[in-house]
Amino acid sequence: MHSTVTHRPKPARSKDGELRHLMNLTAVGVTLAGVILLSVILYAAWAANSSASAREIALFGNAVNRSILRLLNEQKSVAWWDEAYTAITDAKPNTEFLETEFGIFLSETYGHDIVVILNPDNKPIFMYSGGARRSADDFERYRNVFAPVLAEIRQVKGRSLRLRPDLFGANQKNYRTIGSPLQSARWTGHLLTVDGAPAAVGALTILPNVDKSLLKPGRPHVLISVNTIDEAYLQEQGRSLLLSDLTLGKTANTNSEYAGMPLETDDGKIA
C-alpha cells in the first residue's frame, strides 16, 4: 500500500480582488495626504495670524513710545522758556501766567488731561484739569501714581518702572540754544494707570532756554502732564497704523476675527 501526501492548494487571488485591494490602499493614501495637507494649511494660517498679531502688538507699542515723545515735546514748548522759568521760580509764582501758559495752553492746544507743576520739594504749586485750576488736595489723589515718575526725574536710586527707549533725548542732540542748562535737564515718560484708565505720563524739568544767568542752584521745578488713552486716542493711532478696528475694552473679545492683548502699564499692572 502506498501512502499519499495531499494538501489543499490556496485559491488563486482573482484580478478583481487585487484591484480592490489596490484601490483601498490608494484611498487610504489619498485620505492621509489630504489630512496632512489640511494640517499644513491650518498651521500656516495659525502661524500667519500669530505673526500678524505680534506685528500689530509691536506697532501699538511703538505708537505708545511715539505718543510719549510727542507729550514731552509739547511740554518742552513751555517748560524750556525764560519767561515761564521766571514766572515759576519767583518768590511768588505768577499764577495767572501759569494758568494761561501751562494749564489752558497745554490742555486746549494739545489735549493734556492733567497738568501739574511741582516745586523743588515736590509740592504742587499749580494743577489744572477739567478746564479749571485744582487745589493741592486734588493733587494728593495722584501722588502715589506720579511717585515713581518723579523718582526718576529726581534720580532716586532703584527703578520701579519698565524701561522705555529715550526718543526725546535722541531729539535733543542738535539743541544748541539751551546749552549748559540742558546738561542738567531731566525727563521721563511712561504708560501708567490714572483714574482707572491707561495714560501716557510725561515729566520734564523746567529751564530757561536763552538767558542762562536765570538758572538757579538746587533742584528744579518739574512739569507733569497726563494724556489719557481713550477711544479717541486709539482711533487716531489706528488710522496712523492702518488698524481701523483698534479698540479698548475691559474684557477680552471672543470674536475669532480679532486679536486681543492685555494692556500692561509700565508698573506691571493691567490697565
Model-derived features with residue positions:
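Extracellular/periplasmic juxtamembrane segments that couple receptor/chemosensory ectodomains to their
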Residues: 193-221, 229-230, 239-244, 250-271
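Generic detector of solvent-exposed, compositionally biased contiguous segments
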Residues: 158-210, 256-258
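Positive-inside N-terminal membrane-insertion signal
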Residues: 1-34
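N-terminal post-signal-peptidase region of extra-cytosolic proteins
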Residues: 97-102
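Generic short beta-strand
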Residues: 105, 114-116, 189-190, 260-261
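Juxtamembrane extracytoplasmic/periplasmic/luminal helical "stalk" adjacent to the first N-terminal
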Residues: 19, 29-91, 111-113
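Extracellular/periplasmic ligand-sensing ectodomains of membrane signal-transduction proteins
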Residues: 87-94, 106-180, 223-236, 253
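Short, hydrophobic-rich beta-strand element in sensory/regulatory alpha-beta domains
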Residues: 75, 112-117, 245-249
